[in-house]
């Protein structure tokens, strides 16, 4: 399942050059925002209990252990906090000609047509070109409500700013993975390929391009009390 890579305590991890996981101090991801790497390529619909209950509890216990009561937050460089403020103000004061709803509709239709469950190289490559159009449209986006109180226009624009980037990354990752696995079903690569693709995809948006790397899948247990369950074909 997709999400921010974490260890089983919910601590966010970053990949190093020697392929080892390094903890990002103080940063945690919990629930469906995280990828602990227990569900493989997919999980049954609505079955989030492991992520939410088991690892959610583990994350809470870990946070209680490492965060001292009444401790102050470490100083954050003003240059970093300013990035968030600048993004907020840029979108709030956007005076382009294209409403957010128009760009969002284009994004939704592109993802539905070009990145549905069943896909192939042709339709995904077409989708990569199409999804860049609403992304480029961010430069001409219009936010009519400039207020700071219950501004749904601004909220929807902030949401779209996130969604369009996730859409670009999703499309690129799907086009890059030359196999079928879980809910990723390629008409041109119908079989799962554990030899070449038994790994997590890591993706970074860089403008209109996507940088792709990989992270190993855990194929071991932390104790001898339970056995490792190898992946199986998804059949019903």
Where are these predicted regions, by residue range?
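Glycine- and aromatic-enriched mobile tails/lids
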Residues: 1, 5-29, 33-236
């Amino acid at each position: 399942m997709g999400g921010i890579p974490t260890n089983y305590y919910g601590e966010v991890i970053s990949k190093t050059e020697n392929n080892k996981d390094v903890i990002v101090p103080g940063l945690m991801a919990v629930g469906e925002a995280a990828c602990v790497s227990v569900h493989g390529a997919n999980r049954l619909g609505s079955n989030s209990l492991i992520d939410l209950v088991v690892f959610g509890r583990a994350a809470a216990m870990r946070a209680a252990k490492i965060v001292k009561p009444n401790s102050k937050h470490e100083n954050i460089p003003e240059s970093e906090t300013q990035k968030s403020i600048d993004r907020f103000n840029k979108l709030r004061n956007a005076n382009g000609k294209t409403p957010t709803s128009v760009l969002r509709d284009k994004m939704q239709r592109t993802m539905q047509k070009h990145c549905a469950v069943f896909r192939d190289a042709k339709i995904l490559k077409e989708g990569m070109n199409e999804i860049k159009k609403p992304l480029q449209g961010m430069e001409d986006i219009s936010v009519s409500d400039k207020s700071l109180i219950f501004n749904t226009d601004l909220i929807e624009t902030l949401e779209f700013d996130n969604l369009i980037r996730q859409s670009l990354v999703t499309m690129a990752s799907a086009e890059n993975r030359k196999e079928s696995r879980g809910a990723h079903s390629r008409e041109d690569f119908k079989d799962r390929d554990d030899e070449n693709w038994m790994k997590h995809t890591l993706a970074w948006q860089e403008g209109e391009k996507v940088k792709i790397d990989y992270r190993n899948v855990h194929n071991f247990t932390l104790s001898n009390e339970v056995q490792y369950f190898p992946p199986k074909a998804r059949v019903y």
